[in-house]
UniProtKB/Swiss-Prot annotation:
Pfam families, per database record: RadC, UPF0758_N
PANTHER family documented for this protein: DNA REPAIR PROTEIN RADC, UPF0758 PROTEIN YEES-RELATED
Annotated coiled-coil segments of the chain: none
Occurrences of domain MPN (ranges): 102-224
Descriptive protein name: UPF0758 protein Ssed_0385
InterPro entries in the record: MPN, RadC_JAB, RuvA_2-like, UPF0758, UPF0758_CS, UPF0758_N
Keyword DNA-binding: no
Gene Ontology BP annotations: proteolysis
Matching SUPFAM superfamilies: JAB1/MPN domain, RuvA domain 2-like
Organism annotation: Shewanella sediminis (strain HAW-EB3)
The keyword Secreted appears for this protein: no
Length: 225
């Protein structure tokens, strides 16, 4: 059953237009994106099955085409609809943290980093460069692969900071395992970077470790001071 076949006022699209997006469940919002269900399943039921099968919206939206198209009723067209919705969400997040934006909201930073790094199958070490008023200069991915104290070079970080004339930075990396808890190696890297940045009078504001569903902040744990 497609959304257009729902009785007047009962479909998720009509509910959205009447009440706004807030009252809609994840399955109802996804049904609006999918538009149609399959034989024996409404669009909402199909959406609910997809979310349940993949374990959540983020897992569904980051799944491969092969994984999604294995599901009954899902093909290349519906996969493209999901990818478009996911990309729009990511681009909105990028615009919220665009160059010149004053970084005063920790939740905004968390949301941005989660969207950038949480779905990576490999480790990425990145840096958010800020000016003296904590306005965004640039987000740069520096290293990929196994991130440990031997693979992150403070010299490269310092060179980038000097090149971009940054006054403060937030470093971050993801854990593909999904567990955000920092390792001993993560803490060692942070200490080395903090020392290197202090030599050029640049502040290390935070080191954030991104997992599947959470971000651990070194600053919040008191590990930066």
């Amino acid at each position: 059953m497609g959304i257009k076949d729902w009785p007047d006022g009962e479909g998720p699209r009509e509910k959205l237009l009447k009440l706004g997006v807030g009252p809609l469940s994840d399955a109802e919002l996804l049904a609006v994106v999918l538009r149609n269900g399959v034989q024996g399943l409404s669009a909402v039921e199909l959406a609910r099955n997809l979310i349940g099968q993949f374990g959540g919206l983020r897992e569904l939206l980051t799944a491969s085409e092969i994984e999604v198209c294995r599901m009954p009723g899902m093909g290349p067209v519906k996969f493209a609809q999901l990818q478009a919705a996911a990309e729009l969400s990511k681009r909105i997040s990028q615009q919220n943290l665009k160059r010149g934006k004053i970084l005063s909201d920790p939740d905004l930073t968390r949301d941005y980093l989660m969207r950038q790094l949480a779905d990576r199958a490999y480790e990425v070490f990145a840096i958010l460069l800020l000016d003296s008023q904590h306005r965004v200069i640039q987000f740069v991915e520096l290293f990929r692969g196994t991130i440990d104290s031997a693979s992150v070079y403070p010299r490269d970080v310092v060179c980038l900071v000097l090149e971009k004339k940054a006054a403060a930075v937030i470093v971050c990396h993801n854990h593909p395992s999904g567990v955000a808890e920092p390792s001993l190696a993560d803490r060692r890297i942070t200490e080395r970077l903090k020392f290197a940045l202090e030599t050029i009078d640049v502040s290390l504001l935070d080191h954030m470790v991104v997992g599947d569903r959470e971000i651990v902040s070194f600053a919040e744990r008191g590990w930066i001071d």
